[in-house]
Amino acid sequence: MGIVQRHKKIAFMGVKGESGTIVYTRMQKFTSLTQNKNSIEYSRQYVDEPFNRTDVMGYGPTIDYAFDKHTADTVQTDIINITDKELMGDDAVRTIVIVDLSAAEPKAIKRDYSIIPSSEGDNINVYTYSGSFKARGAAEACASVTSNDEYQTISIT
């Protein structure tokens, strides 16, 4: 048993490659990728009990993001394009895969997210972007995850 280091859980975004196929590319140079479950609660108090009861009825997962803008980064370029062009609907949806490299066999979960930009340029030293990825459906466990380039890109099944 041991502690899991943050850099052992890495994220990949599906970005269209030059051939038009989706390439799951590592999300690098992010200063924040915080997952929030956003539980949907149902609370009530029954007349015959002196306390409240709360049940979880669902979830509204999000990932809050922030990054320092780097040149020639395909994931950042894609997010910046969505932000600058104010894309909406399906044009602002991407698949994100979270890979856990702390296990003996890497495990991966994928989910579609809407990219919800929030702010940009709020640092005096470097140009930054931030926002949220909001769940657009259920998460799916991937049967396998492989990489031929030290986890710069991945293939999933």
Task: Give the label of every model feature segment.
Residues 110-157:
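Mixed-charge, glycine-accented linear interaction segment located at domain edges/termini
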Residues 62-66, 95, 130-134:
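Beta-strand secondary-structure signal
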Residues 1-70, 114-125:
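Solvent-exposed edge beta-strands and adjacent loop segments
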Residues 17, 40, 47, 67, ...:
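Intrinsic disorder/low-complexity signal
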Residues 76-109:
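Short, acidic/charged, Gly/Pro-enriched secondary-structure junctions
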Residues 10-13, 30-31, 91-98, 115, ...:
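Generic preference for hydrophobic/aromatic residues in regular secondary structure cores
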